[in-house]
Regions:
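Mature catalytic domains of secreted/periplasmic carbohydrate-active enzymes
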Residues: 37, 81-84, 103, 109-118, ...
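Catalytic nucleophile-loop/oxyanion-hole region of alpha/beta-hydrolase
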Residues: 78-79, 85, 99-136
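Short beta-strand element of the alpha/beta-hydrolase
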Residues: 61-71
């Protein structure tokens, strides 16, 4: 058994890990199963989110929603990180959304801008809930790594609001799903 681990399993894990590091998802992402919306414009940058829902969901009824924020150390990453999770949750009746936000490698920003963008995304979702078939009182947020930080921060920290937004619309999610 030890020989198998040394000769097959461990080298396989190494190769797969190395391949994962080298594989860079394209940016901006292409997600043909989703509808794409611009939720915020900052200078020349349009921040987008991708909404996944089944055809049945677009025809009436209010459904719970979740918005995912990608990981990447506040430096990089792609909203496509949560594409599969969005597809799965949409197939189960939720409206699932993955959002872009500003990161340092593309926008020369700090982590505080990520939190501002996360709050803007939740606010946009609530503001557009009726046209998306979403129950505006059942909006969850989730993310992995830096994206988990964004989700946790928008749920717990006051401030970091973008100018010109309607602060009467809550930017706090009703539930959280945080990874690592």
């Amino acid at each position: 058994m030890l020989a198998y681990l040394e000769k097959v399993f461990l080298p396989s894990i190494f190769v797969l890990s190395f391949a994962t590091v080298l594989a860079k998802p394209s940016y901006p992402p292409q997600m043909p199963d989703a509808r794409e919306f611009t939720y915020k414009k900052v200078s020349q940058t349009e921040l987008k989110l991708w909404v996944f829902q089944s055809e049945k969901q677009t025809k009436g009824g209010k459904r719970p929603a979740i918005v995912f924020f990608f990981g990447g150390g506040w430096k990089g990453g792609t909203p496509a990180q949560f594409e599969k999770q969005c597809q799965y949750l949409a197939s189960r009746g939720m409206v699932a959304i993955t959002a872009d936000y500003r990161v340092s490698s593309r926008h020369q920003t700090k982590a505080t801008a990520c939190v501002e963008d996360g709050k803007s995304a939740v606010r946009w979702i609530r503001q557009n809930a009726s046209k998306l078939g979403i129950d505006r009182n059942k909006v969850a947020a989730g993310g992995g790594s830096a994206g988990g930080h964004v989700a946790a921060a928008i749920a717990t920290i006051d401030g970091f609001e973008s100018q010109g937004e309607d602060l009467d619309i809550s930017s706090r999610p009703d539930a959280l799903t945080l990874f690592n």
